[in-house]
């Protein structure tokens, strides 16, 4: 016998939980299908365990910096197994919360792997479920290239399973995941090498952030190799070797981490049985309202090819439920001006357009402001990472279309500035805001002279 629901969410990660929770709050009958622990990548092998370890790495840095401020810190060595055990207990508590919360909401939890039978019917381990509305929110998985010896490396999932600290690490990829793991491992004392196919780190970010990040990583002791095309991994008694297409060899690593992107978890869902369009890369295209090409079937989160960020999946899921069940027929997520943070050492953040993006989209109408400095946090230390900031402003009114920050506190300070950008704030609005002193964020409201005006060329390497 087939059980019928108002909504079925396939995937118990951020997006699936959000749409299921909201639909249940509207009194709808909801089923949630998941084969693993609730919380998805973010809770189990992503944002949450990463952030716990990021905090630990900053404590290690603080211990090293303490003597410069007259604080005699003792110890400072890392107990990796203890950190991992505490981290995993914390994740387990979050899993338990979600298990109980889903039950309290009256959501039917279905354990197993879902496959479409038709556009409104799902089969899970021999059990059939149907719904008026089905949401696909199955997230993604780390990519491992098909190269000789690729199995000698681990992914970010494997990193969070490590029971001992790796001592000499190669990270392949310089996106969010690669940069974040590089920073925290180096702060723990590991030797770290990052290789990337692109010609700069975090190539999708503003060039100022990429350049400052490279400078800070170099000062931290992280070795980088750009335009390095990995052809194979090899292993001998000395460890694992990275072999580039041009024959360059980097040798002697005890761990190699693949951080070259993520692929959508859409294989084996039987999407073809429902007639759901799937792109060659596995992404499920949707319109602005999360509709797929099949009425009553929706997709959200990483599988749609949009911003692969937890808050984006949550926001899209909640808005979808409001549209379907709360009479808000035009409710949808605005994907413009979504803020994001990379938890590097120090972190970097952005909202809006980079300078090259703004130039391409808006034309030669930009006024750009920049600053860089070493913050007071390192006033009594011999060295400290650089902070850098950029405002990208457009038109004669100088509407702020991009805010870019790297430095201590960048992760927390950007949220408020993101509200301002979303509301259409101008440079004059920033100027008319009284600064908080002393602090790094005040620089964003006290920038005076532009470094570039309309008609000025982009700086070299900023295209």
Swiss-Prot record:
Any one GO MF annotation of this record: NADP binding
Pfam family, one: Pyr_redox_2
Residues given in the record as NAD(+) binding sites: 50, 174-180, 197-198, 230, 261, 308, 341
SUPFAM superfamilies recorded: FAD/NAD(P)-binding domain, FAD/NAD-linked reductases, dimerisation (C-terminal) domain
Keywords noted in UniProt: Disulfide bond, FAD, Flavoprotein, Metal-binding, NAD, Nickel, Nucleotide-binding, Oxidoreductase, Redox-active center
Cofactor binding: number and manner: Binds 1 FAD per subunit.
Keyword Nucleotide-binding: yes
InterPro entries: FAD/NAD-bd_sf (IPR036188), FAD/NAD-binding_dom (IPR023753), FAD/NAD-linked_Rdtase_dimer_sf (IPR016156), Glutathione_Rdtase_euk/bac (IPR006322), GSHR/TRXR-like (IPR046952), Pyr_nuc-diS_OxRdtase (IPR001100), Pyr_nucl-diS_OxRdtase_dimer (IPR004099), Pyr_OxRdtase_I_AS (IPR012999)
Task performed by this protein: Catalyzes the reduction of glutathione amide disulfide (GASSAG) to restore glutathione amide (GASH) in the presence of NADH. May play a role in GASH metabolism under anaerobic conditions as a sulfide carrier necessary for cytoplasmic sulfide oxidation.
Protein name: Glutathione amide reductase
Organism the protein comes from: Marichromatium gracile
């Amino acid at each position: 016998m087939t059980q019928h629901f108002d909504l079925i969410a396939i995937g118990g990660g951020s997006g699936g939980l959000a749409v299921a929770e909201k639909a249940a709050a509207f009194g709808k009958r909801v089923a949630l299908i998941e084969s693993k622990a609730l919380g998805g990548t973010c809770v189990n092998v992503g944002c949450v365990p990463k952030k716990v370890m990021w905090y630990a790495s900053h404590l290690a840095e603080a211990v090293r910096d303490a003597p410069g401020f007259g604080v005699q810190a003792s110890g400072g060595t890392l107990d990796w197994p203890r950190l991992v055990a505490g981290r995993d207990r914390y994740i387990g508590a979050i899993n338990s919360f979600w298990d109980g919360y889903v039950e309290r909401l009256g959501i039917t939890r279905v354990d197993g792997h879902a496959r479409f039978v038709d556009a409104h019917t799902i089969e899970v381990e021999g059990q059939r479920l149907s719904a008026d509305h089905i949401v696909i929110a199955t997230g993604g998985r780390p990519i491992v290239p098909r190269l000789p010896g690729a199995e000698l490396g681990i992914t970010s999932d494997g990193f969070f399973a490590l029971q001992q600290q790796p001592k000499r690490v190669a990270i392949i990829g310089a996106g969010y995941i690669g940069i974040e793991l590089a920073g925290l491992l180096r702060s723990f004392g590991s030797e770290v090498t990052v290789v990337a196919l692109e010609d700069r780190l975090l190539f999708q970010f503003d060039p100022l952030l990429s350049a400052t990040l490279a400078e800070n990583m170099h000062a931290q002791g992280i070795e980088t190799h750009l335009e390095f095309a990995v052809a194979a991994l090899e292993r001998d008694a000395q460890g694992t070797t990275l072999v580039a297409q041009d024959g360059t060899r980097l040798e002697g690593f005890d761990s190699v981490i693949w951080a070259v992107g993520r692929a959508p978890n859409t294989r084996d869902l039987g999407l073809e049985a429902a007639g759901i369009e799937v792109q060659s890369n596995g992404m499920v295209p949707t319109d602005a309202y999360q509709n797929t090409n099949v009425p009553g079937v929706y997709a959200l989160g990483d599988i749609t090819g949009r911003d692969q960020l937890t808050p984006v999946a949550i926001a899209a899921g909640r808005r979808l439920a409001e549209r379907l069940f709360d009479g808000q027929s035009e409710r949808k997520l605005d994907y413009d001006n979504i803020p994001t943070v990379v938890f590097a050492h120090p972190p970097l953040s952005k909202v809006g357009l980079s300078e090259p993006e703004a130039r391409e989209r808006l034309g030669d109408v930009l006024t750009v402001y920049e600053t860089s400095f070493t913050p007071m946090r390192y006033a009594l230390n011999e060295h400290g990472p650089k902070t850098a900031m950029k405002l990208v402003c457009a038109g004669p009114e100088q509407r702020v279309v991009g805010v870019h920050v790297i430095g201590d506190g960048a992760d927390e300070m950007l949220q408020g500035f993101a509200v301002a950008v979303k509301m259409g704030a101008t440079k004059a609005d920033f100027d008319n805001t009284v600064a908080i002193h002393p602090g790094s964020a005040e620089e964003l409201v006290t920038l005076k002279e532009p470094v570039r005006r309309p008609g000025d060329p982009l700086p070299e390497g900023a295209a």
